[in-house]
């Protein structure tokens, strides 16, 4: 297995409830290492840019509003099979369908307020990491 990097975000519903440490602990327990992290309050413009892939979807406006409603923690995670491992630890997008022991089963409030975001492929991981971090900010 190759060591890879992925992008991870702790969303406003989770930071609002002081779950940052608990979520990071679950990621680290799964063997993922945080190699870059910062707390940001997204502007509407940043949220629109980050989620531009969804701009034609009916939920786009609500997503942008939610993501700019409070602080997020953006991170770069590193580990073996990091993308798949992070997605496994996060659980299904809809917390009602998430497996026991996953972040979303434990902490998500709804399909919209589902506590975390993670890249789904190497290409999106690279794009999402570059959106928030310069190369010098990633130290691992």
UniProtKB/Swiss-Prot annotation:
* GO CC annotation, single: cytoplasm
Single GO molecular-function term? ATP binding
> Where ATP is bound, by residue?
11, 59, 87, 93, 104, 114
Alphabetically, which GO biological process terms does the record hold?
CTP biosynthetic process; GTP biosynthetic process; UTP biosynthetic process
Q: Which Pfam families match?
A: NDK (PF00334)
User: Does the record's keyword annotation contain Cytoplasm?
Assistant: yes
Q: How does it assemble?
A: Homotetramer.
In terms of PANTHER family, this protein maps to: NUCLEOSIDE DIPHOSPHATE KINASE
Protein's UniProt name: Nucleoside diphosphate kinase
Biological source species: Brucella melitensis biotype 1 (strain ATCC 23456 / CCUG 17765 / NCTC 10094 / 16M)
């Amino acid at each position: 297995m190759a060591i890879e990097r992925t992008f991870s975000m702790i969303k406003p519903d989770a930071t609002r409830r002081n779950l940052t440490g608990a979520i990071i602990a679950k990621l680290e327990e799964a063997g993922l290492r945080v190699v870059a992290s910062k707390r940001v309050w997204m502007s509407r413009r940043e949220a629109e840019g980050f989620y531009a892939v969804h701009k034609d979807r009916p939920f786009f406006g609500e997503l942008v509003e939610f993501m700019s409603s409070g602080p997020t923690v953006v991170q770069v995670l590193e580990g073996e099979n990091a993308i798949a491992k992070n997605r496994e630890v996060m659980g299904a997008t809809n917390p009602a369908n998430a497996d026991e022991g996953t972040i979303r089963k434990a902490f998500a409030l709804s399909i919209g307020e589902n506590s975390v975001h993670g890249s789904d492929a190497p290409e999106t991981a690279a794009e999402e990491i570059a959106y928030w971090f310069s190369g010098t900010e990633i130290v691992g």
